[in-house]
Design a protein with these regions (language model features):
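All-alpha prenyltransferase/terpene-synthase fold signal
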Residues: 1-291
Length: 291
């Protein structure tokens, strides 16, 4: 299959899995909770993290579907983070992916609980994985929890909040972005390799790729906040203008060069894998996108 067909297959598969996971619970008395969870979880999006998990699994020589529980778990954690990021106590956003944010539809309390449930249920989903090497399951759960928690995404959000009232250095911005955005991309790539039965060297290479791609992806995101439109992005633009970003530090022109630099460095980390055409193409498309 060509690159477009592969991408569509990955997205269709994860959409089907996520749709079916909560079908079992619609008759539970707390059905409004599941409605709030599905409102954000099934709202579409790029499904970047599942795609990365599937592709790294495939590049390690295993059926890509093996990574499904890990791919779903990372996407659930990503969705919970978006719900919480949009809350009035965080970014206070009204729109996400072209429609009202979760708390605008279900209220703040239900939005918090929907995020909490998605985070917790992600580990239940991950526990259903069938690994080529079952002894690596503790490693996988450690990767998922570390990337999502205080040393990863949550830690990055904290650093972002603490930096709001002052000017930050490049190193400080790197510390925020490598955790806030890069950590879950790292989880997706690393878990894909583990699901595929990859080597320690491949796990390390996937982590390096993820760190560099995550940085390029976030810089591009910050650029789009300045040059994109609400129609393109599905949310209000200009909301990050007061935040410490590379765009604020260096301006758009230098950031464009940084995106190219980090994307190329990311692609170079894939030499240890075979058949990397799809992933190289994906990396370049992601960092040249308009939404």
């Amino acid at each position: 299959m060509n690159n477009e067909e592969r991408s569509c297959a990955y997205i269709a598969h994860i959409e089907s899995f996520l749709n079916s996971w909560y079908d079992l619970f619609h008759n539970e008395p707390q059905k409004q909770l599941f409605q709030a969870m599905e409102y954000s979880l099934l709202a579409g999006g790029k499904r970047l993290r599942p795609i990365l998990a599937f592709e790294f699994c495939r590049m390690c020589g295993s059926p890509w579907e093996t990574a499904t529980p890990f791919a779903a778990a990372v996407e659930m954690i990503h969705t919970y983070s978006l719900i919480h990021d949009d809350l009035p106590c965080m970014d206070n956003d009204d729109y996400r992916r072209g429609r009202l944010t979760n708390h605008k539809v279900y209220g703040e309390a239900m939005a918090v609980l929907a995020g909490d449930a998605l985070l917790t249920d992600a580990f239940s989903v991950a526990s259903t994985v069938q690994l080529p090497n079952p002894a690596q399951f503790p490693l996988a759960i450690g990767v998922l929890s570390e990337c999502a928690g205080s040393l990863g995404m949550v830690g990055g959000q904290v650093l972002d909040i603490l930096s709001e009232q002052r000017e930050c250095t490049e190193e400080e911005i790197l510390a925020v972005q490598s955790r806030k955005t890069g950590a879950l991309i790292n989880a997706a790539c690393t878990l894909g390799v583990i699901a595929g039965g990859g080597t320690e060297e491949q796990i390390a290479a996937a982590g390096r790729f993820a760190g560099l791609l995550g940085l390029a992806f976030q810089i591009r995101d910050d650029m789009l906040d300045q040059i994109g439109t609400k129609e393109e992005l599905g949310k209000q633009t200009g909301t990050d203008s007061s935040k410490n970003t590379f765009v604020r530090l260096y301006g758009l022109k230098k950031c464009e060069a940084l995106v190219d630099k980090y994307t190329q460095l990311a692609v170079e980390q894939l030499n240890i894998f075979q058949d990397t055409v799809f992933l190289c193409d994906l990396a370049r498309k992601l960092t040249a996108r308009r939404n």
